[in-house]
């Protein structure tokens, strides 16, 4: 029986993880649930159903509501609060697997606590690798943690790698394993056929209406701008130790092929399934074995048209910014991630237009005095400066 801590249990990844656990109660139990605390009713329901030992939130204003809700339902889960307690839950000797599904840099110290404890970590949070990939991979190597990416694209690549390579993420050279290129696929988002002149008018609701995936609002907007694909590009560099000429990006509308590996003998290994996050999460939970989940099997007769297109980079300026930043150092990717969080939040609040997201991100990259961070503290300092500058630009709108 593997005990699990879920960082971000009320989000999309957290909810899907719990569904898988529900169908595999002979294999997994929930040790602790962690959430910021905005969706208290959801968190209370999760505690009642899964009976974790602990639940912990960051939002102090919701602490009383959480305690009263659990008491009312006679739930014996212990309530904790704050960063220190979350770090302790992430590093507890009782825990076998940590699911890292927080948004942005908010979970950076929790994740590093898990790494230092040598945990098996299922990583859904791309932003942390975007902002501190160098430090992240060094810590993983030092403490011998097991990292399994569970976003669909990196998980697809991971599954297609030789077993020995899987155990050496961030260190192994793809050349030694006969790999020519990694191919990241992307649907192109909900606006792939919208006229460029009309993109300014699109609403947050339209941007969140992804054609293939059900996701949270932030990642849905990132998918619409293809910043998400840009972040995946950056993460692939760190996880799989590849350079510019070893990553290829392709538009694949159907999201059936999640990513591919092109080998030096001309063969291509592709990972295919219906677009459902439970596939990659279940792979991570069961690794190195596979576990059965209540998921639909891919029907090749119903899904018999798979298309591929080159990317129109004029349509996706955020993707361009991410690729450029990835070769300008850790500081640049940290700044881009931070600026993007603020600009996406402003768009969701209808303070700026959809097309302003890329404009603000570029302004912050151009105007901020970016330095190469040499510690987590310096990364957080750079993060703060980028956020403040982005907010300053937004006030001008």
UniProtKB/Swiss-Prot annotation:
Cofactor(s) this protein requires: Mg(2+); Mn(2+)
Uppermost EC category: oxidoreductase
Binding site for Mn(2+): 151, 153, 232
Residues annotated for 1-deoxy-D-xylulose 5-phosphate binding in this entry: 126, 152-153, 187, 210, 223, 228-229, 232
E.C. code: 1.1.1.267
Catalytic activity from the UniProt record: 2-C-methyl-D-erythritol 4-phosphate + NADP(+) = 1-deoxy-D-xylulose 5-phosphate + NADPH + H(+)
Sequence positions that bind NADPH: 10-13, 39, 125, 127, 216
Gene3D superfamilies: 1.10.1740.10, NAD(P)-binding Rossmann-like Domain
Keyword Chaperone: no
Pathway as given in its UniProt record: Isoprenoid biosynthesis; isopentenyl diphosphate biosynthesis via DXP pathway; isopentenyl diphosphate from 1-deoxy-D-xylulose 5-phosphate: step 1/6
Keywords of this entry: Isoprene biosynthesis, Manganese, Metal-binding, NADP, Oxidoreductase
One GO term of the biological process aspect: isopentenyl diphosphate biosynthetic process, methylerythritol 4-phosphate pathway involved in terpenoid biosynthetic process
One Pfam family here: DXP_reductoisom
GO terms assigned for molecular function: 1-deoxy-D-xylulose-5-phosphate reductoisomerase activity; manganese ion binding; NADPH binding
Claim: Nuclease is one of the keywords in the record: no
Complex and partners: Homodimer.
NCBIfam families the record matches: Dxr, PRK05447.1-1
Function: Catalyzes the NADPH-dependent rearrangement and reduction of 1-deoxy-D-xylulose-5-phosphate (DXP) to 2-C-methyl-D-erythritol 4-phosphate (MEP).
Name of the featured protein: 1-deoxy-D-xylulose 5-phosphate reductoisomerase
Source organism per UniProt: Wigglesworthia glossinidia brevipalpis
Gene name, Swiss-Prot/TrEMBL: dxr
């Amino acid at each position: 029986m593997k005990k699990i801590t879920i960082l971000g249990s009320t989000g999309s990844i957290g909810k899907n993880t719990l569904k898988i656990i529900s169908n595999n109660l002979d294999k997994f139990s929930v040790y602790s649930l962690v959430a910021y605390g905005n969706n208290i009713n959801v968190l209370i329901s999760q505690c009642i159903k899964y009976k974790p030992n602990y639940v912990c939130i960051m939002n102090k204003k919701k602490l009383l509501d959480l305690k009263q809700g659990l008491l009312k339902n006679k739930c014996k889960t212990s309530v904790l609060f704050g960063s220190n307690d979350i770090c302790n839950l992430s590093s507890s000797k009782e825990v076998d697997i940590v699911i890292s599904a927080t948004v942005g840099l908010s979970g950076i110290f929790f994740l590093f606590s898990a790494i230092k404890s040598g945990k098996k970590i299922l990583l859904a949070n791309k932003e942390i690798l975007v902002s501190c990939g160098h430090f992240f991979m060094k810590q993983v190597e030092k403490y011998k943690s097991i990292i399994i990416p569970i976003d669909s694209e990196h998980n697809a690549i991971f599954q297609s790698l030789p077993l020995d390579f899987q155990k050496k993420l961030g260190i192994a050279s793809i050349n030694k394993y006969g790999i020519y290129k990694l191919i990241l696929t992307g649907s192109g988002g909900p606006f792939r056929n919208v006229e460029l002149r009309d993109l300014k008018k699109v609403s947050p609701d339209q941007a969140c209406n992804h054609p293939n995936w059900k996701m949270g609002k932030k990642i849905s907007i990132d998918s619409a701008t293809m910043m998400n694909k840009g972040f995946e590009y950056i993460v692939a560099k760190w996880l799989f130790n590849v350079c510019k000429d070893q990553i290829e990006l392709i538009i694949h509308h159907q999201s059936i092929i999640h990513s591919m590996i092109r080998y030096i003998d001309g063969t291509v290994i592709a990972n295919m399934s219906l677009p459902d996050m439970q596939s990659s999460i279940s792979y991570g939970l069961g690794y190195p074995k596979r576990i059965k989940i209540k998921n639909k099997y891919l029907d090749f007769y119903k899904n018999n048209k798979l298309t591929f297109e080159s990317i129109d980079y004029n349509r996706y300026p955020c993707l361009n910014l991410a690729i450029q930043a990835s070769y300008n150092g850790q500081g640049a990717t940290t700044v881009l991630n931070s600026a993007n969080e603020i600009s996406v939040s402003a768009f969701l609040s209808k303070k700026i237009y959809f097309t302003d997201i890329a404009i603000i991100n570029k302004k912050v990259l151009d105007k901020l005095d970016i330095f190469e961070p040499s510690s987590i503290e310096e990364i957080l300092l750079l993060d703060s400066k980028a956020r403040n500058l982005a907010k300053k630009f937004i006030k001008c709108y």
